[in-house]
Amino acid sequence: ADDKLKAPTYMETTSEYLEDFVIMVSPTSPAYTAAYDYAGDVRWYNTLNLAFDIKRARNGRLLMGTDRLVAPPYHTTGVYEMGMIGKVYREYRIPGGYHHDEWEMENGDILILTQYLPRGTVEDACVLVDRKTGKILKEWDHQDVLPVYPVGGSGSQDAHDWFHNNAVWYDKKTNSLTFSGRHQDIIINRDFETGKLNWIIGDPTGWPED
């Protein structure tokens, strides 16, 4: 077998729990992105240099970050819609590039995490992309609602990577978006329509009182 196709060193689950699903793993080492069943056996793999974030779309295809870099260390051109045998049906290219996460909306449009590279910051914005045309329909810039560096913070926070958004989640009931901000040690929730900041969860240490 190809030495880039890695077997898990440890896996604990059952066929009753996992059923016909697989666990997809996208490594940051020189290894293939792969899917494993309950026994740890490889059921699927991809030879492209993919890092983020594989999700099964409602049509059965896969959504994942592309393998084409626009800025180091891992910001790529956008998101692929790919079939299980590797055929790329669409590439959604984002002007600021893609990182970490995407979310398929009920109507098929896609939330994609991005940034505005010319201003010198990363991982602090999100866009809504039309599934059929690739056009950007809405944008949420976290600099509109949050104080920028130095606020709160982890040890790896700096002015360039002040927020470090790792994930996005849409809640239909409240019509809102939830984002994680690793470098400010917070989770925030924003109104989908207006972008208004609804709430912040996190340690208030290091934050201005207002």
Please identify what each model-predicted range represents:
Residues 1-210:
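Histidine-/acidic-rich catalytic cores in large beta-rich domains
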